[in-house]
Regions:
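Alpha-helix N-cap/helix-initiation sites
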Residues: 47-52
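N-terminal capping segment at the start of a domain
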Residues: 30-46
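N-terminal hydrophobic or amphipathic helices/low-complexity stretches enriched
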Residues: 2-6, 10-33
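Cofactor-binding active-site loop characterized by glycine-rich and histidine/acidic residues
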Residues: 40, 53-128
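A short, structure-level motif marking secondary-structure boundaries and short turns
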Residues: 22-23, 43-44, 78-79
Length: 128
């Protein structure tokens, strides 16, 4: 398995690192994620708000502190993968991707638009 430097990864995987990282400010980013979920759902006029809000803390913790996915190497075969089986929570996934820099605000604003990769339910073809 290819060795990754800490500089190009989202975070360390140790429980201590997760605890230390989340202790700094456990709710600020998750609150921003919730605000994105609500604003994107309102803007698009669709979305499963309850499902997305209920998983916001979990998805933000995974993307913010646990998953090792370099933003510049999304196709790296050795990176972590995330499968969202709770597809109705796609807005939480998309918001996390935006907050971590995987997608732009312009792309986030295409949510549920014609030709967008960001549908109400995530597709397996997304590279993040």
């Amino acid at each position: 398995m290819k060795e990754h430097s800490k500089d190009n990864m989202t975070s360390s995987r140790t429980p201590e690192a997760v605890t230390a990282a989340t202790a700094v400010n456990p709710t600020d980013s998750a609150r921003k994620l919730r605000e994105l979920i609500l604003s994107q759902s309102k803007r698009a006029g669709v979305g499963h708000i309850g499902s997305a809000l209920s998983i916001a803390d979990l998805i933000w913790t995974l993307y913010g502190y646990v998953l090792r996915i370099p933003t510049s190497e999304t196709k790296d075969p050795d990176r972590d993968r995330f499968v969202l089986a709770k597809g109705h929570a796609a807005l939480a996934l998309y918001g996390s991707l935006f907050l971590k820099g995987y997608i732009s605000e312009d792309e986030l604003n295409t949510f549920c638009g014609e030709g967008s990769k960001l549908g109400v339910h995530p597709e397996h073809c997304l590279e993040w």
